[in-house]
């Protein structure tokens, strides 16, 4: 997603890197400048968040609220009351992001097979593409470090307590 946001020409000097000519270590190093934001660059998440929010300026209020309040970088998590409401919101958001920012809202996951059936296979998360939504049980999905059992619609928390001896210092 970061690659969708261009770096302004006056800032490209700050995003330089060296690479061997023709990818051959025996040849000279060439200096390149990034034209787009890349994964691993510190400001990229903030740029992506800003870009997403800018894309929905002027959109319907529900789309703006979804993107501005329910996204963390490029993951949107929301709970809605009905299948129709979920499908309508996601489709409207897909359309706005595509038109306003040439961004693709995909990797869709839901605890409702009906919601996922409303979208093309390429819009679904990779784990969901191979499922037969009429027959298969929905798997456990992990997003933002949180495990979600789609079948029972519950979150799963895995907590690992370190093995440390009981001492006064530890408790005081």
Where on the chain are the PLM-derived regions?
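Conserved acidic
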Residues: 1-172
């Amino acid at each position: 997603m970061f690659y969708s946001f261009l770096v302004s020409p006056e800032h490209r000097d700050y995003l330089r890197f060296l690479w061997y000519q023709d990818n051959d270590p025996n040849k000279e190093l060439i200096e390149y400048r990034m034209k787009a934001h890349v994964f691993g660059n510190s400001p990229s998440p903030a740029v992506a968040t800003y870009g997403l929010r800018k894309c929905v300026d002027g959109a319907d209020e529900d789309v703006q609220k979804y993107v501005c309040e329910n996204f963390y970088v490029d993951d949107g998590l929301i709970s809605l009351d009905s299948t129709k409401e979920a499908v309508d919101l996601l489709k409207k958001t897909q359309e706005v992001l595509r038109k306003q920012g040439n961004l693709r809202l995909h990797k869709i996951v839901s605890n409702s097979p009906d919601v996922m059936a409303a979208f093309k296979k390429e819009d679904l998360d990779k784990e969901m593409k191979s499922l037969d939504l009429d027959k298969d049980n929905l798997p456990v999905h992990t997003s933002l470090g949180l495990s979600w059992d789609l079948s029972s619609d519950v979150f799963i928390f895995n907590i690992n307590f370190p093995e440390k001896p009981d001492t006064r210092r530890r408790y005081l």
